[in-house]
Amino acid sequence: MTPVSSRPRHWVIGDVHGCADSFEQLLKRLPAGDRLIICGDAINRGPAIEATMTRIWELVEQGRAVWLRGNHEQDLIQALRGGSWQQQRQLAGCDTFRHLGETNCRRWLERLEHLPLAYWGDGWVATHAGFDPVSWQPDLRVRMGFWQHYDGRFGEVVIGHTPGPHVRRLPHIVMVDTGACYGGELSAYCPETREVVAVPGLRPETPRALPGLRTPLSSGGAIAGR
């Protein structure tokens, strides 16, 4: 295990999406006394969803981690709370619901409902996708509108939500989702030092291509990791 650092820092971890093995490997690479910020979308997609949720919650209860809400957690909350046929159909297509079953999902519901939307650090903030460029409230689905209009008012914003081949930097924005569930990496970024730590993500027999999303990198680029 990496030694405890003299001054605890923060590590913002990208979308885990049920990749429990990668998450454990990443934990071994991070200083034991530092704070972990799970940047939402810990559930769905990967092969070990319940193990991922349980492990993260253990860290939350120990006071070591903060689990932020992502759009996948929000969708599950809304589907479990609703009774419409559209929401029941949404549950039927939810990986977490299929893996855990209705009883276990409902046991998790209150915890998920209390997940915060953002974590505010000293000169930086972590949130799942960004902020609405009109209200400047956390938005779990925003992409281009935030990337193009964020003016640095909150300092550096560290987000997940949009996967890419490496941790990317835009003006005042750092994007830490590196596609662990697509055969990419699971990455952690330290806002205090701008250091990146990454481990291999899921290695499926047939790798899934990253979603075809374009990220405006002309004013930024990759952040080297170790």
Language model segments and positions:
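Acidic, His/Gly-rich catalytic cores of divalent-metal-dependent hydrolytic chemistry
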Residues: 5, 149-226
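Active-site-proximal beta-strand elements of phosphoester/diester hydrolases
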Residues: 10-17, 124-130, 174-176
